[in-house]
Amino acid sequence: MHVVRLSIHRLRRFQTVELHPSSALNLLTGDNGAGKTSVLEALHLMAYGRSFRGRVRDGLIQQGANDLEVFVEWKEGGGAAVERTRRAGLRHSGQEWTGRLDGEDVAQLGSLCAALAVVTFEPGSHVLISGGGEPRRRFLDWGLFHVEPDFLTLWRRYARALKQRNALLKQGAQPRMLDAWDNELAESGETLTSRRMRYLERLQDRLVPVADAIAPALGLSALTFAPGWKRHEVSLADALLLARERDRQNGYTSQGPHRADWMPSFHALPGKDALSRGQAKLTALACLLAQAEDFAFERGEWPVIALDDLGSELDRHHQGRVLQRLASAPAQVLITATETPPGLADAAALLQQFHVEHGQIARQATVN
């Protein structure tokens, strides 16, 4: 899939601006604070329902405005499938939102998020590796959400059961009142965990060659999954029963896939905690690119790939390796930088360049 039009209204520095990117490599340059990242934020907002830099109400809406609007038009399919044009719009006030997809109102943000797939690498992406388990769970679930049509229903089923069980625990409910929600949590949780495990195994097969291509010095060798309870010893139903009294005392559910995690392993490093910030960024980028490749294999088309501030996040050597990997794939890529990154200098003829300044985006002539 590739975006053919991105229209942004009242978002940070932009009053009204439109971008018509190419279907391949795109570079947006401009001074710090010019609004380059805001372009990717708008795209990310449509694909995830949130910005990668915080909540909508935390500064994303232009000062003095009541809401923001983002409109995206993109092509999907092609090849063996019939290409079609899709359109989505989102208006967000920070508290309330309205959305449309292909001319119809949508009742849930998930409908918009399921339609447009964007893989984003930005300065905070290192937390995928160096942070807590929540971003790693979201990473797994994003991949499943986009390649398994019924995954969102399963995830919501588990989340609802977890919410109800936790509410009863906080109320100090009697054990018999927990039985029904324990059964629901165990049934949906076992299925959710099996899906995550299969996905991570498949992703590992894609990740190792990607990491070897863009950062061979990392020596990334495997991904290890922790399901959130001692699954090799007991079922989730038994784990919930065994932990019931402790959970009642603490007021929350301590066992289950909401506590799951996964970790990368390396040939020459003891684990992710031994990584430098730069190594964590490279590992995160390798994971994201592997996820994009898996999406492409399963769906028959690539997601849009957004790389924010590439020049300051990766050195020239790694920029070149990443670009080489992306150039071999029919993916639309949007890159931001204050100036053309050294790793992209030799690929100027392949780039569609844009300059962002004073709240406007100007298309620049392609270098031949």
From Swiss-Prot:
What's one GO BP annotation on this UniProt entry?
double-strand break repair
> Which key words are in the record?
ATP-binding, Cytoplasm, DNA damage, DNA repair, DNA replication, DNA-binding, Nucleotide-binding, SOS response
Q: Binding positions for ATP?
A: 30-37
**UniProt GO cellular component terms:** cytoplasm
Q: What is its main location?
A: cytoplasm
Q: Where in the cell is it found?
A: Cytoplasm
| Database matches in Pfam families | SMC_N
Q: What terms describe the molecular function in GO for this protein?
A: ATP binding; single-stranded DNA binding
InterPro entries from the xrefs?
DNA-binding_RecF, DNA-binding_RecF_CS, P-loop_NTPase, RecF/RecN/SMC_N, RecF_2
Q: What family, per the record?
A: Belongs to the RecF family.
Q: What does this protein do?
A: The RecF protein is involved in DNA metabolism; it is required for DNA replication and normal SOS inducibility. RecF binds preferentially to single-stranded, linear DNA. It also seems to bind ATP.
Write down what this protein is called: DNA replication and repair protein RecF
Q: Which organism is it from?
A: Xanthomonas axonopodis pv. citri (strain 306)
What is the primary gene name for this protein?
Answer: recF
